[in-house]
Amino acid sequence: MKCPRCSKQEIRVLESRSAEGGQSVRRRRECMSCGYRFTTYERIEFMPIMVIKRDGSRESFNRNKILQGVMRACQKTPVTVRQMEELVNEIEEKLQLEDAQEVTSLRIGEMVLERLQHLSEVAYVRFASVYRQFQGIKDFVNELEQLEPPLRRDLERLLQDSSASDSESSGSPDLVGEYS
């Protein structure tokens, strides 16, 4: 390996450790010629996966494309960069473990949506609007209606739990009855 500063090949490894949940090795290196220190990452090289796009064309799987789309969808949400990177790592790992040489862009999009729904509903709807090519407000409404039942169940459960504990302890009004 060459030094990124002076291009000499006199490099020594100062430290090695597992990174990305064991998916890579992080090495801290030092050039013996100029003293420059830098970090490298080693990853397993998987078989290349070809993505079949909507128009039938094929291109190599590019995790950065997925990450960019997820980052756009997650702008101004509480989702962290680490969570976004983990989402992309999960998808890439799942595809590699399936040992598929080809995958459709539609399948990748569904995998992203499935994971975004658990991270941020706002990011989910943003990603879905591009991925599913929403044409108008009706498309947004339809997508939101599909998200609504789990939210309604969670809200009803929360209100029931709250009213049960309130009525047992203080005799306060039944919130579920007032808002049903």
Swiss-Prot record:
Record text on cofactor binding: Binds 1 zinc ion.
Keyword Repressor found: yes
Sequence segments annotated as region (Disordered): 155-180
Record carries keyword Transcription: yes
UniProt cofactor(s): Zn(2+)
Composition skew (Low complexity), residue ranges: 160-174
GO MF annotation list: ATP binding; DNA binding; zinc ion binding
One Gene Ontology term from the biological process aspect of the record: negative regulation of DNA-templated transcription
First and last residues of each zinc finger (unnamed): 3-34
Span of domain ATP-cone: 49-139
UniProt KW keywords: ATP-binding, DNA-binding, Metal-binding, Nucleotide-binding, Repressor, Transcription, Transcription regulation, Zinc, Zinc-finger
Protein function: Negatively regulates transcription of bacterial ribonucleotide reductase nrd genes and operons by binding to NrdR-boxes.
PANTHER family found in the cross-reference section: TRANSCRIPTIONAL REPRESSOR NRDR
Family listed: Belongs to the NrdR family.
Record's protein name: Transcriptional repressor NrdR
